[in-house]
Every structure is written in C-alpha cells, then in structure tokens.
C-alpha cells in the first residue's frame, strides 16, 4: 500500500469534528474581531473617520459574518461565555469547551495582530510613537475595553454581567424553535442586530466586552506588542472583569430564559406539527448538501 500523501493526511485530520469545530471558531472569531477592532481603530485614530455607532455596526455585522462563516459547523459561538453557558446547561459536552475557547482565543489574538499591522502607521502617528494605555492619546483601547473614570470596578462588573445576560437570553430566544425564532436563514443577521442594539443601548459604561474571547486575547497582544503591564493594571486591575463577569451573566441569562420562558411556551399540537414538518424539510436539504461534500450540520440551536 502506498504511503498517504500529506494532502490526504491533512484532509483526514480536517474531517474530524473537533478539528473542524476548532477551525470554525478560530476563523469566525477572527472575522468578527477584524471588523470590530477595525471599526474601533477608525473611531480612535481618525478625527472624522469613525464613530461610536460605527463601532457597534462593525461588531454587529462582524458577528453576522462570523455566523455565516461557521454557523453550520460549530454554531459560531465566537464567545467563551456563550460556550460556557451551553456546556453548563447541558446543551453541549464539556469536552468541547477547551476546543471552542482555544479556537476563539487564537482567532481573536490573530485579529488583534492583523489590526495592529493594518493601522501601524496611524497608531504611531496618533501618539507620536508612544504606546499609551490611558489619556487622550491612548491607543490600547483600540484592542480591549477600559473602565471610564466615572465607573467603579464593581459597577463595571454588574454592567458586564447584565449586558451579557441580555445577550444570552436573547440568543436562546432567537434560536428557540418552540417560541418565535428568527426566520430560517436570517439568524446571522438577527444575531448581528442584537449585538448592535446592545451596544447602542447599554455599551457606554464598560465598553460592552460581553465576551472573554473578545477582550483578553487582544489585551495579551497589546502587552506583548509594547503597551506593557499597564494594560492589566489600568482601571484598578479591570482586566479580569470582562473575563469573569460575562461567564456569570451569560449563565444567569440562560437560566432566566430556560427557567421562566421556555417551559411556559404553549405546546400547541398543530404548531409542533408545523415545526416538525419544517425540520424534516431542513434535514432533507442538508442531507442533499452533504452528498455534495457540503457540511450539513447547522447547530445554531447551541446558542
């Protein structure tokens, strides 16, 4: 028997579900973060090139594109808090948690590096070559969130937990087939709109990281790239809040929806029959797609 070629070996590895899900989370998070961080760079560095609304649209539609990239493979969580909640509530196995989060962290870190390279000249010009974490010429806030002076650490914690809870509650609602889910095929757009709405309504106080995978890897990049230890010390050691608070908030938001709303949905037989018929059609279409070597699993319900 002839030895397997390198290409065949790579294809064999990529066919494993865990590997595919890792790569899906990596690429979807990378796409989301490039659009999101790029929009922040425009607001910080360009006098008239960006705005706060632009940042929210950048992250919102970045999420939409990320779900389009990987929604049919991993569900495109792009958020360690969402992954944690799905594992904690039994909607996916814990063995997938490190795979998803590692993919998200590496994708986010890579996006931060990409953003730095794209805006390298503008970053150096903006602060005269200095890499500052605080002050009017700060550029570290392009990559991670920092607490404003009027906010205390614990108020920021509650803010992050609450906004992430709203995110998770609405994600469960959007993908709940027994309630009023988004129309089939519109889920990426609706989820992106959700992120945009959270930003324009609740994002001012803490920068609405609402995602450990969005905040910690870029912060680590800035530490390595020259901004130094101040990226962890600023804001009374704010760095850990966008990591811990979203985990708690998403979990509580998930419990609120599954505990209060999901059991209260009327089990109308005709409605359930309609959902079953729709699901059978969707399953059949994905089986046909699979025969054409296209992935047929769309686990968006993991949200």
Curated annotation (Swiss-Prot):
Catalysis: reaction(s): glycerol(in) = glycerol(out); H2O(in) = H2O(out); urea(in) = urea(out)
Activity regulation, free text: Glycerol transport is regulated by pH, with the porin being permeable to glycerol at pH 7.4 but not at pH 5.5. Water permeability, however, is not influenced by pH.
Site location (Selectivity filter): 59, 208, 214
Superkingdom of this protein's organism: Eukaryota
Residues in the Extracellular compartment per record: 40-52, 118-152, 203-206, 221-238
Record PTM: Phosphorylation by PKA could prevent the interaction with PLIN1.
Segments carrying motif NPA 1: 79-81
Membrane topology: Multi-pass membrane protein
Pfam families (UniProt xref): MIP
Function of the protein: Aquaglyceroporins form homotetrameric transmembrane channels, with each monomer independently mediating glycerol and water transport across the plasma membrane along their osmotic gradient. Could also be permeable to urea. Mediates the efflux of glycerol, formed upon triglyceride hydrolysis, to avoid its accumulation in adipocytes and to make it available to other tissues. In the kidney, mediates the reabsorption of glycerol, preventing its loss in urine, again participating to energy homeostasis.
Protein's recorded name: Aquaporin-7
Organism: Mus musculus (Mouse)
């Amino acid at each position: 028997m002839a030895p397997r070629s390198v290409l065949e070996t790579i294809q064999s590895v990529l066919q494993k579900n865990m590997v595919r899900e890792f790569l899906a989370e990596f690429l979807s998070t990378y796409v989301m973060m490039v659009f999101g961080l790029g929009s922040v760079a425009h607001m910080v560095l360009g006098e008239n090139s960006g705005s706060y609304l632009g940042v929210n649209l950048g992250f919102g539609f970045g999420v939409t594109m990320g779900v389009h990239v990987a929604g049919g493979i991993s569900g495109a969580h792009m958020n360690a808090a969402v992954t944690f909640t799905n594992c904690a509530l039994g909607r996916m196995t814990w063995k997938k948690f490190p795979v998803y989060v590692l993919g998200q962290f590496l994708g986010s870190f890579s996006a931060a590096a990409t953003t730095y390279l794209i805006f390298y000249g503008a970053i150096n010009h903006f602060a005269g070559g200095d890499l500052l974490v605080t002050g009017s010429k700060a550029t570290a806030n392009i990559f991670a969130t920092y607490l404003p002076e009027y906010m205390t650490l614990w108020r920021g914690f509650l803010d992050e937990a609450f906004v992430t809870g709203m995110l998770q509650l609405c994600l469960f609602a959007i993908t709940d087939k027994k309630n009023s889910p988004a129309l089939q095929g519109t889920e990426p757009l609706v989820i992106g709109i959700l992120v945009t709405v959270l930003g324009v309504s609740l994002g001012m106080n803490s920068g609405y990281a609402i995602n450990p995978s969005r905040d910690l890897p870029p912060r680590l990049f800035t530490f390595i790239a020259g901004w130094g230890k101040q990226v962890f010390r600023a804001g009374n050691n704010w760095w850990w809040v966008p990591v811990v608070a979203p985990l708690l908030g998403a979990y509580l938001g998930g419990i609120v929806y599954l505990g209060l709303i999901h059991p209260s949905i009327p089990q109308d037989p005709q409605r359930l029959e309609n959902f079953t018929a729709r699901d059978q059609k969707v399953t059949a279409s994905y089986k046909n797609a699979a025969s054409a070597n296209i992935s047929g699993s769309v686990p968006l319900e993991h949200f």
